[in-house]
Curated annotation (Swiss-Prot):
Belongs to the enolase family. (2R)-2-phosphoglycerate binds at Q165, K335, R364, S365, K386. GO terms for cellular component: cell surface; extracellular region; phosphopyruvate hydratase complex. It is an enzyme of class 4 (lyase). Pfam families: Enolase_C, Enolase_N. HAMAP family: Enolase (MF_00318). The active site is at E207, K335. Mg(2+) binds at D244, E283, D310. InterPro entries: Enolase (IPR000941), Enolase-like_C_sf (IPR036849), Enolase-like_N (IPR029017), Enolase_C (IPR020810), Enolase_CS (IPR020809), Enolase_N (IPR020811). This is Enolase. The keyword Ribonucleoprotein does not apply. Catalyzes the reversible conversion of 2-phosphoglycerate (2-PG) into phosphoenolpyruvate (PEP). It is essential for the degradation of carbohydrates via glycolysis. NCBIfam families: eno.
Amino acid sequence: MFDVVISDIEAREILDSRGYPTLYVKVITNTGIFGEACVPSGASTGIKEALELRDQDPKRYQGKGVLQAVANVEKVLLPALQGFSVFDQITADAIMIDADGTSNKEKLGANAILGVSLALAKAAAATLERPLYRYLGGAFSHVLPCPMMNLINGGMHATNGLQFQEFMIRPISAPSLTEAVRMGAEVFHTLKKILQNRQLSTGVGDEGGFAPQLASNSEALDLLLAAIEKAGFIPGEDISLALDCAASSFYNTQDKTYDGKSAADQVAVLTELCDRYPIDSIEDGLAEEDFEGWKLLSETLGDRIQLVGDDLFVTNSALIAEGIAQGLANAVLIKPNQIGTLTETAEAIRLATTQGYATILSHRSGETEDTTIADLAVAFNTGQIKTGSLSRSERIAKYNRLIAIEEEIGPEAVFQDSNPFSKA
C-alpha cells in the first residue's frame, strides 16, 4: 500500500448528552478515507485531569462553548500533522503534545487533542478495512468486558440528595456480553416498576440511571437488591453490586472530613456496607487528595473487594505509578479524555495491568453517540466497562456496539470479568 497520510482535519462544535458543547473531529486521508470522533465531557472531574478547553464567553452556552478548541484543531493541529502517516499514532500524539507544550494540555485543550487522536486511529482502521478494536489490539483482542451498569444515580449526576454518585450492578454470572446486557435490562425495568409501585420518581440522571429521592445510600442498595431478586436473579451469585462514591465531591479539604466524618469513619461506613451487601467494587471511596485515607481503605478492604481509583489516578501514568508505589487502590478507571491522547491512554492501561491492577474503560456523564470506548475495552482486553444504565441512547449505543463486536468475533469471543474479587 502506498503512503496514506493525513490530508485534512475538520472540527465543529456539537452538543453532548447534557446539551453542552463538545467537539466533533474528522481526520481525512489523501485517499479520501476518514475517521470521526466525538469527545465526551465529565461533570465530576479530578483536579489533575487534562484541561478541557472552554471559551468562557458568557454570551454563548453560558461560557461553555468550544470554538477555541475547534480553531486549535484546524489552525494548529492540522498544520502540525498534515502529511504524516495515518498509521503512526504514537508520533502523531507526541506531535500534538509538543504543540501544546503544557503538562495538562491547557493551551490547546485535551478535548481538541483527544478528538484528533481518536479520529486518527479510526481513519487508520478504516484504511485497512478493520474494526477499530482489531486495528488497535490485533488478533488477541477477543475479551468482552463485564459491564458495570449504573441503575441509580446520585451525587453530581442527579439532584436527589443521594451522597454517593453511582449505584451499579454487575451481571457476573452471564455467559456472554449479550446475556449480560439482557440481565441488566431486565433488572432495570424491574427496578422501574418497583419505583412506580412505591410512588418514587422514575426520572433519570445524566447516565441514564433512576434518580429518586431517597433517604440514604442503604435505601438505594436495598432497591437494587429487591430489583435483582424480583427479576429472578440471585444477589451476589448472578449479579453483584458496585459503588462510585465520588468522595471528593463531599470532602472538606480544610478539616479533611467527609460530611463531618473522619477518613476512618468513611472507611468504617464502606466496610459496613460491604458486610451487609454483595458489593465487590468501590470507586473513589476516599477523596483524591486524601492519601492517608486511601491507605487505610486499601489496608482494610483491599483484599476483599476491587478498589477503583478514578479521581485518584485520572488515567495519568505518573499518578498511577505513584499510587501503586504507595499501595493505594487495586484497580484503575480509564477515561481517555482525562489524559487527552490514545497513546497515553494505552500506556496507562499497560502500566496498571503489568502491576496487577485491574482496568475499567469508562464513559463520562456528558456523552455522545460515539462508541469508541466499546472498541477500546475490547482492543485492550480490560475485562470491565462503565457506560451507564440501560436507557438514554448515548449509553445504549455503547452496549449495542459491544453486542455487535461479540457477534463479529464469533466463537473466539470470551466474556471475562477482570475483577479478581468477583464471586461468579
